A protein has these predicted regions:
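N-terminal pre-ligand scaffold of iron-sulfur
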Residues: 20-98, 112, 127-143
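Sec-dependent bacterial lipoprotein signal peptides
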Residues: 1-18
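Short cysteine/histidine-rich metal-coordination sites, predominantly Zn2+-binding motifs
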Residues: 96-106, 118-131
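Generic hydrophobic-segment detector
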Residues: 4-7, 39-40, 106
């Protein structure tokens, strides 16, 4: 019995020690955006690979359309705050001209726009927001 408990404890520790820490230090700011895709300012989101900047969030939000299935999985939204420099003036992420990466203007660290994964392990994780899509309206929230 004691051996079984010890083995289960080791398995539990092993599973949870391998998890990546996806938490960010970016301060919490309530986000509750509603985008109508038919509006001209949101036209880039009507096609795969399109993106728009929003003024909400901590340093702004980038919304990217990664698929065209007609559901919430089509979109991804991140705060534009750099995880490493969010409290500095240069700590705002911008989409690079190739439309593939977000880059920090402080140190040039990059994240894939399609999923927010860092190009380098030490870059940190982006603050992602929940997206819900239906009837031509995209909701972006963090609550």
């Amino acid at each position: 019995m004691l051996r079984t408990i010890s083995i289960l404890g080791l398995v539990f520790i092993g599973i949870y020690s391998c998890r990546k820490n996806n938490q960010t230090n970016i301060p919490y700011v309530p986000v509750n955006e509603s985008l109508v895709l038919a509006e001209p300012s949101n036209f880039p989101l009507t096609s795969v690979g399109g993106w728009v900047y929003l003024q909400s969030g901590y340093r702004g939000i980038i919304v990217y359309r990664k698929a065209f299935n007609g559901d919430s999985e089509d979109f991804i939204a991140f705060d534009r705050a750099c995880p490493r420099h969010f409290d500095q003036d240069c700590g705002r992420l911008n989409v690079e001209t190739n439309d593939l990466y977000l880059a920090c203007t402080c140190d040039g660290k990059r994240w894939l726009l399609i999923n927010g994964f860092p190009e380098q392990d030490d870059a940190g994780f982006l603050q992602q927001y929940q997206t819900t899509f239906g009837s031509g309206i995209l909701l972006i929230r963090n609550f």
